[in-house]
Amino acid sequence: MQLKRVAEAKLPTPWGDFLMVGFEELATGHDHVALVYGDISGHTPVLARVHSECLTGDALFSLRCDCGFQLEAALTQIAEEGRGILLYHRQEGRNIGLLNKIRAYALQDQGYDTVEANHQLGFAADERDFTLCADMFKLLGVNEVRLLTNNPKKVEILTEAGINIVERVPLIVGRNPNNEHYLDTKAEKMGHLLNK
């Protein structure tokens, strides 16, 4: 186990009341959060979203990505389902950090795509560690999920880490003229399933 469960509190939202559960990485002290809606106990697979932190999309309403749209759509679907989990994975900018993300944006403004920009900065296309999310699911007592994602790599890593993904639920929202090239690059170079 790479992290521990450290705190929880009620979080009222426009979608209803969630239980906010805080986790801390044992090696680094970095924190992550789960939003739990309804009763997730039992043997029925839980609708879940692993949402990687995106300050620009989630809080600043950037149209450069689909992150904020995905966050809102996931919370809506979880609330409509009556139960579910959103893991807020605190690895900003596919885990290159906010300042490097801004640098990557500047490179994208010069014509690089999102993958090329990461490479220019010395990073892989995706630096995230989804095994942390498997540990969060386990600490919440959940082993079977219906995962809201377009990223088959996320499904693969969580499965390898012991989470039974019984269904991949597409989450295709937020395409606009400002992020079309970004989304096309994610599909072409990172294997994201954006047409299904």
From Swiss-Prot:
Subunit structure comment from the entry: Homodimer.
Miscellaneous section: Catalyzes the formation of GMP as minor product, with concomitant release of pyrophosphate. Release of pyrophosphate requires magnesium ions.
Similarity comment text for this entry: Belongs to the GTP cyclohydrolase II family.
SUPFAM superfamilies assigned to the protein according to its UniProt record, in alphabetical order: RibA-like (SSF142695)
Organism for this UniProt entry: Escherichia coli (strain K12)
Protein known as: GTP cyclohydrolase-2
Needed co-factor(s): Zn(2+)
Top EC category: hydrolase
Residues reported in the UniProt entry to bind Zn(2+): 54, 65, 67
Cysteines joined through disulfide linkages: none
Control of this protein's activity: Competitively inhibited by pyrophosphate.
